[in-house]
Amino acid sequence: MSESIKVRAQRQAHCKDCSLSGLCLPLSLNMQDMDALDDIVKRGRPLKKGETLFRQGDTFSSVFAVRSGALRTFSVTDGGEEQITGFHLPSELVGLSGMDTEMYPVTAQALETTSVCEIPFERLDELSVLLPQLRRQLMRIMSREIRDDQQMMLLLSKKTADERIATFLINLSARFSARGFSANQFRLPMSRNEIGNYLGLAVETVSRVFTRFQQNGLLEAEGKEVRILDSIGLCALAGGAMDA
């Protein structure tokens, strides 16, 4: 990976001891199979905010599971403009989209101090042949990525600014809840500008919508801290929110 962070193997953490194992690749694996997966996982020092895990155009070699913190992925257009393609929370995999062309089509960058597990794809592929449950979990993850892409297309083509941001917040709420955090009170790892870029909205529009949501009693927001006051109302506004 050019100018990227190489994650070197350290054995200070194990899949079987990780609180996220029920959401990540080890889902449904028994202890012996989990040990086999753990043997190929590499763990290294945390990424600092703004550090790059891999860059658009780098040779595809590994997928990465977020252990703590958060990443954003983005592509750069021919005109040099960044387009954010996703935000990735603990237990979520990053890098699978490079499998087809054997190059990463996006850049992955830390939004805050972030730890990841590196999983060399060749070894993961070999192991998945031996462990059908691991192969099925990989297929589930890829299926979810396809579903998320389809939902994002619908979000950008059909919904108003209020609906887009409501859907975004409900989706984040569900993802935080699945990880054992509060569904109604959380800190956004991304900026308003990054939310706008992702949702196809101007940052001024994002700020106005947050203000309107507060005036309507849907939530409280101070900086990146968000407290949802009316989850039912927010879900209704989303008009069929995305699943976690």
UniProtKB/Swiss-Prot annotation:
GO terms for molecular function: DNA binding; DNA-binding transcription factor activity. The keyword Magnesium does not apply. Residues 159-232 form the HTH crp-type domain. It comes from the Bacteria. Keywords: Activator, DNA-binding, Iron, Transcription, Transcription regulation. InterPro entries: cNMP-bd_dom, cNMP-bd_dom_sf, Env_Response_Regulators, HTH_CRP, RmlC-like_jellyroll, Tscrpt_reg_HTH_Crp-type_CS, WH-like_DNA-bd_sf, WH_DNA-bd_sf. It holds the Pfam family cNMP_binding. GO terms for cellular component: cytosol. Residues 192-211 bind DNA. The keyword DNA-binding applies. NCBIfam families: PRK11161.1. Transcriptional regulator of arginine deiminase. Possesses 4 cysteines which may bind a metal ion (possibly iron). PANTHER family: CRP FAMILY TRANSCRIPTIONAL REGULATORY PROTEIN, FUMARATE AND NITRATE REDUCTION REGULATORY PROTEIN. This is Transcriptional activator protein FnrA. The gene is fnrA.
